[in-house]
Amino acid sequence: VKEYPINICLINSGFTLGSKIDRDHFFNILTEKYGMYANYEPDSYPGINLKYYWNELTQQNPDVRGRCVCNEYCEGTGVGCGDGQCRRVSIMIFQSGQVIITGCCSIEKLEYIHEFIKTIHKNEYLTNN
């Protein structure tokens, strides 16, 4: 029997925030307060499409966490560690409170991003809505 190395390259997940979401308000929190790259056009897609740029170099800095601040050209298709090496993760947030995360390459990163969204929802959205 020949053994083949296994490399996890894509993990998708879904969860609920437990309440309905005012997408305009949540979108404004994500883009204005956190400076995140997100798109929300309800005429073409029913959810907020958030891009989280994972990079070990910025994870400990809350001012830039989730954003690409690379000096080198970066497409978001890197390994997630180093200048120009961000790993782009897509997060879709719907009015129902359902959230879909796609593009993670490890359970640890998935759990971190899951907590990141839940914390913004709890600390920013629920307290100011």
Where are these regions (language model features)?
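Extended intrinsically disordered, low-complexity coil regions enriched in Ser, Thr, Gly, Ala
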Residues: 1, 102-129
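Intrinsic, low-complexity N-terminal interaction/targeting segments
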Residues: 1-93
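Conserved beta-strand elements of beta-rich interaction domains across eukaryotes
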Residues: 20-22, 98-99, 105-108
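Short, structured motif recognition centered on aromatic/hydrophobic residues
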Residues: 90-93, 98-103, 117
